[in-house]
Swiss-Prot record:
GO terms for cellular component: chloroplast; DNA-directed RNA polymerase complex; mitochondrion. DNA-dependent RNA polymerase catalyzes the transcription of DNA into RNA using the four ribonucleoside triphosphates as substrates. The gene is rpoB. It is found in: Plastid, Chloroplast. In plastids the minimal PEP RNA polymerase catalytic core is composed of four subunits: alpha, beta, beta', and beta''. When a (nuclear-encoded) sigma factor is associated with the core the holoenzyme is formed, which can initiate transcription. It comes from Saccharum hybrid (Sugarcane). GO terms for molecular function: DNA binding; DNA-directed RNA polymerase activity; ribonucleoside binding. The keyword Chloroplast applies. This is DNA-directed RNA polymerase subunit beta. It comes from the Eukaryota. Its EC number is 2.7.7.6. Keywords: Chloroplast, DNA-directed RNA polymerase, Nucleotidyltransferase, Plastid, Transcription, Transferase. InterPro entries: DNA-dir_RNA_pol_bsu_ext_1_sf, DNA-dir_RNA_pol_su2, DNA-dir_RNAP_su2_dom, DNA-dir_RNAP_su2_hyb_sf, RNA_pol_bsu_bac, RNA_pol_bsu_CS, RNA_pol_Rpb2_2, RNA_pol_Rpb2_2_sf. It catalyses: RNA(n) + a ribonucleoside 5'-triphosphate = RNA(n+1) + diphosphate.
Amino acid sequence: MLRNGNEGMSTIPGFSQIQFEGFCRFINQGLAEELEKFPTIKDPDHEIAFQLFAKGYQLLEPSIKERNAVYESLTYSSELYVSARLIFGFDVQKQTISIGNIPIMNSLGTFIINGIYRIVINQILLSPGIYYRSELDHKGISICTGTIISDWGGRLELAIDKKERIWARVSRKQKISILVLLSAMGLNLREILDNVSYPEIFLSFLNAKEKKRIESKEKAILEFYQQFACVGGDLVFSESLCEELQKKFFQQKCELGRVGRRNMNRRLNLDIPQNNTFLLPRDVLAATDHLIGMKFGTGILDDDDMNHLKNKRIRSVADLLQDQFGLALGRLQHAVQKTIRRVFIRQSKPTPQTLVTPTSTSILLITTYETFFGTYPLAQVFDQTNPLTQTVHGRKVSCLGPGGLTGRTASFRSRDIHPSHYGRICPIDTSEGINVGLTGSLAIHARIDHWWGSIESPFYEISEKAKEKKERQVVYLSPNRDEYYMIAAGNSLSLNQGIQEEQVVPARYRQEFLTIAWEQIHVRSIFPFQYFSIGGSLIPFIEHNDANRALMSSNMQRQAVPLSRSEKCIVGTGLERQTALDSRVSVIAEREGKIISSDSHKILLSSSGKTISIPLVAHRRSNKNTCMHQKPRVPRGKSIKKGQILAEGAATVGGELALGKNVLVAYMPWEGYNFEDAVLISERLVYEDIYTSFHIRKYEIQTDTTSQGSAEKITKQIPHLEEHLLRNLDRNGVVRLGSWVETGDILVGKLTPQIASESSYIAEAGLLRAIFGLEVSTSKETSLKLPIGGRGRVIDVKWIQRDPFDIMVRVYILQKREIKVGDKVAGRHGNKGIISKILPRQDMPYLQDGTPVDMVFNPLGVPSRMNVGQIFESSLGLAGDLLKKHYRIAPFDERYEQEASRKLVFSELYEASKQTKNPWVFEPEYPGKSRIFDGRTGDPFEQPVLIGKSYILKLIHQVDEKIHGRSTGPYSLVTQQPVRGRAKQGGQRIGEMEVWALEGFGVAHILQEILTYKSDHLIARQEILNATIWGKRVPNHEDPPESFRVLVRELRSLALELNHFLVSEKNFRVNREDV
């Protein structure tokens, strides 16, 4: 965070900074650290040694541009060169060799892998170290445990049982005596007793059997190995057994790492050097000693809070990429060893480069990274729905992933907000559903200490000198440091009314909220936004909203679709500009100069005697099928300054974020069309393209070689197809640019050869061959057809040919989508709804000046949801629209005076009423409300209605992608019922409760059809088609449906036989014995 020259002013840090800093640390430190660990590969038989050096590695500039990598589905990467040495007998060779390619981060903070933008999000994990806890069992006896967590997530648990014996348990396996563990680690009994504070406790459970186990290190190792590896029988001590134990336990389970060593030293008051990153006998001894102190009352019962951020660490992009680089070097080591053996079989003289150059070896690095980006849960496809999404995605923190929690097993406490989150992790912004509380977002001022992995937050230091001079020094505090400070909240009323010495202010101290005297304050918050993420900081009047609705709002803003005509909000928070700039969707001038020319593809800039061409993005598809487009904003001949906006991206206006539209809304019921969150809209929003958005769909097809060895062919000459379907194809069989295509049209014509046997020829085919010598076509038509709902304009066709038989064709189709019934809209306060009806504008309710309303919301959606911020926003928006003003309001404006929001809104409405000479804008009897008229009758409504200008977004959940119907389709293999889901062409589920509803209406025949013919009655399903075609009566089958037979089989697996038979009029009188 940077200080400005102005007193108390500061700038918000760059929102993508965390990703860039992480990647820079990987390049500058991570690569060197892993290269230092690379061992010297020796072959003693042939006196050969191969070694890589950490110093002087180089990364070349990427060989392709970002755009070309996306266009050609390649990986944007850079070649890594490393110094290597090869000793071959008495010959020493030094050479700088290439060991492969590393993906490079681009200007968005993302990676391009196989043409797809991907991002690595930060993972938050329990920090390595030791954690103590004490809990009462069912008898009320206190059980104390200490858990040592390694850098790789392995656990060593120490516990004292009811008989006051101390046990160790490795990775939740069988428990083992602590004395055996310490002896196996190399300590004898005298050393143990001399270095503990409670030797008598150790001696109390030292019986003859225990003494025998630890009389020598070898016996202790054998005993430990038997328990650890769960091996029975008589073992004999050997070096190989010792090595296996060293590898499986001491190296994997006991590596603390740099962070773990610091935490261990701090918790147990040890002074072991930082470079000693493995668990030592001294650590286990001190941990056991502390545990005894806790159990027997001589120590303090200080349970560690596992959810406190001081006990968590962030694994950023640097750590994850470094781990993969280490993995790739391990594979490289094995590959080089194989190559060395091969060299001696061929009896050729090796060089450092020839050992690494073979194809499989040189691509090890890039394939390791491509596998990582493709399969690792924290390497996600970059969300490009709108500029806000692009900015926010890289600031996510997740507890999920390898070594972390899972959505199904995470406890409520691990999901909850913790006092240490303040100013570091947003208390609002998290996902809904099973992962609630497990994925969060960093607060806007938070930064990551990449050395220790902790999240830091900035505060103003209020020292005695600073109080005298009225200066403010900014300090960044980590979670373990801010416990010792009295922190005044920056959004409290008293801090902004001029501090008197005797005044009492609200503060935080040791995770508690207090009110204390101003003289006792050490630091204070720097900014009202400090506690929130970007999503939360874009909600105006957030302090008047319930947190659940604010959470929904911050998630829904990320789902807003960029509109064809963007508009910035009348009421905002002031963070819109920085969010738009940091998303990098706009083009910013990097130097000053003069515009030579500008069009939709590029801007030519003259600067310092040079002509610079700045390319623009024109109708490019995003990962979410939205349209990315840059519009030039500078005319020819204009002089520009450095930092000026040259072209605006989608959903930005004037350099500010513009996700929605300011529309006139009324809160009133209207004929039940806005019941339960439905929304009534005016046809003006359709005809004037207010909520029209562009979407780009991608369709692709690839040629292959059949099992008989013949290749598929892309062609326009496709027999048995109507000419109408082929009208848009060029002579190569690919759809033309600019064509308008409808559902079912052929986009790419393709034929797949088939081998037909003599017997399969029809009689006519034999005749044609005999008379004319013509071969009958044996190709199958496998063209790419436009699916349902895909109609639009072809804007791009890509032909990618890697060899003569491997051709990929991609067709991009632009769709223009107006708002329609079934689309989802939302405000910025969690007020979401589905369009239920589009009303002619003359039927919409209208204001006293004749203006028809654009949207009608249900007023019952406000009180129970407690998102009153929308009322403030709409009223202030109306005033701003009439006064031609825009407002930027920081949250918690009650810190200036009480009822500040209400006073601002009423004063602006009064001013608007006065200036426009419209008394209905502000009526003192019901301020904010107005009498409005029914558009159908012209009569005024009985009650005054709240009207205003709200900023409403159109979300990506659109009816075109949701609507679905099925006549017949695939069935499940086991139950023979229709499969589930739109993607699989699935059916509509009729569940138990739906059956009850139909039973309530007594519709027996409809119900029987639903449960048998339309579902899982195999024979009836086949015969109903025949009966329908020939107009016969649908037969009533007596055999059971498939689901009943599945039930019978499941009962048989439980050794229960269930038989059934039909009871009819003929066999109704049966004996009980027969049944």
